[in-house]
Amino acid sequence: TSGLYQKAWPEIVSAFQALGLGDPKEFYDAIVTAGFAIRNGEVGTLGELSPKPHPWLYAEAARVGLGIDFTQRHYVIGIEDSGAGVCSIRLAGFAPIGFAGGNINKGGTRALCTHFADRFDQILSLL
């Protein structure tokens, strides 16, 4: 999301450090965010134009940012801590992994998650 630099990116870096996975920029093929590219060659999208729970952000990130054809959508997962994000992932045709700390449980969207994790290391074991 556009909150990448304020919230998501520091949490991603922290999780990678805690799990001993090194630099997340070296781990992923690309890091696609709403609004900003992390480094040259990566694609950012403007999720503010169609905010969650609209599926456009996830669908466009997979198609344009990662080059994944819609027919291959069953290979795509999304990790979210918000109910709107889970809905967005599901509406895009992807499998959502819910992550604790957001409003998934309170919002009643946990049942839409393919899996749910309380900790990042649990997500790693699902991949």
Tell me what each language-model feature is.
Residues 5-127:
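Asp-based, Mg2+/Mn2+-dependent phosphohydrolase catalytic module
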Residues 1-2:
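Conserved phosphate-coupling serine/threonine residues in phosphotransfer and NTP-handling enzymes
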